[in-house]
């Protein structure tokens, strides 16, 4: 189960984008897309039905989920996330500080 959710602020901890920060756009089983990171050029065919033009499009490629860590808002460092039941509600908490993770919108 992925502990990183759409809208979370993350930092890349491995690979060519190491040290860069961004917001998670989408999460699949073991991969995440981060806004503005791991950009690739894709050759797009024109589509008559949708009216989309052809050409070379720059878009985000996915990163493996093990190469990113959630960014702790108070310490501005990479952190791990756990779950705790607080007042009968299961919430995500930072492992280092025990603070509740802000809900992504």
UniProtKB/Swiss-Prot annotation:
Part of the 50S ribosomal subunit. SUPFAM superfamilies: Translation proteins SH3-like domain. GO terms for cellular component: ribonucleoprotein complex; ribosome. Keywords: Ribonucleoprotein, Ribosomal protein, RNA-binding, rRNA-binding. Pfam families: KOW, ribosomal_L24. HAMAP family: Ribosomal_uL24_B (MF_01326_B). It comes from Acinetobacter baumannii (strain AB0057). One of two assembly initiator proteins, it binds directly to the 5'-end of the 23S rRNA, where it nucleates assembly of the 50S subunit. One of the proteins that surrounds the polypeptide exit tunnel on the outside of the subunit. NCBIfam families: rplX_bact. This is Large ribosomal subunit protein uL24. It comes from the Bacteria. One of its GO terms (molecular function) is rRNA binding. CDD domains: KOW_RPL26. GO terms for biological process: translation. Belongs to the universal ribosomal protein uL24 family. The lineage of its organism: Bacteria, Pseudomonadati, Pseudomonadota, Gammaproteobacteria, Moraxellales.
């Amino acid at each position: 189960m992925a502990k990183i959710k759409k809208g979370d602020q993350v930092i890349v901890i491995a690979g060519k984008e190491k040290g860069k920060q961004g917001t998670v756009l989408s999460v699949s089983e073991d991969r995440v897309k981060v806004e503005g990171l791991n950009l690739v050029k894709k050759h797009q065919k024109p589509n008559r039905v949708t009216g989309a033009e052809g050409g070379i499009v720059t878009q985000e490629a996915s990163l493996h989920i093990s190469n990113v860590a959630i960014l702790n808002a108070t310490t501005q460092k990479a952190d791990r996330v756990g779950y705790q039941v607080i007042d009968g509600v299961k919430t995500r908490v930072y492992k280092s500080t025990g603070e509740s993770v802000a809900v992504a919108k």
